[in-house]
Amino acid sequence: MKKILAIVSSPRKGGNSELLVDEFIKGAREAGHDVEKVCLREKKIAPCLACEACLRNGGTCVQKDDMAEVLPKLMEADVIVLSTPVYYYSVCAQLKAMIDRSLPIGADGGKMRDKEFYFITTAADDPAAMERTMNDLQGYVDCIPGSVVKGKIYGQAFAAGEIRGKSAMGEAYELGRRC
């Protein structure tokens, strides 16, 4: 059994990326895995100040917000699912803030290592256009020693709920079941 952390970064509740994450979770739970879902829209996570205090004081950020509860979850997970709607060919602001604020556990080979990652992106454009966003996510994984990307889902949809009935839903379920 793996411990899975599913990060939903969309600011829109019930949006397409969250629907895909829910399918991934369904498959993973049916396979017997322990899954926790974290919705960043429900968290107060300020942007990184780049003060590097966390690198000097054992990994504690000077900002007192919800990132303090997200960091341990990232470290404890065996598998991390990162989902984002594509905004201007990149990740949404909520996910970018979380990524930047994970410096205390990822810097210089820090405390986070050997994770399996799955990426879920959604956009109205075709999968080729989402590749830039996937590259952004890959950059994060490249900073975490021993970590690998095990799967990617390109959800082509725009309006909330439009992803229902599309092949990406089945792909998300199957990736969750096989992880």
How does the language model describe each region?
Residues 93-94, 107-151:
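Short, glycine-/small-residue-rich phosphate/pyrophosphate-handling segment
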Residues 1-108, 148-149, 161-179:
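N-terminal beta1-alpha1-beta2 submodule of the flavodoxin-like/Rossmannoid cofactor-binding fold
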Residues 87-89, 118, 140, 154, ...:
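Sequence-level detector for tyrosine residue identity
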Residues 158:
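Active-site rim beta-loop-alpha module in soluble metabolic enzymes
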Residues 9, 40, 122-124, 155:
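Cofactor-binding loop segments of dinucleotide-utilizing enzymes, especially the Rossmann-like FAD-
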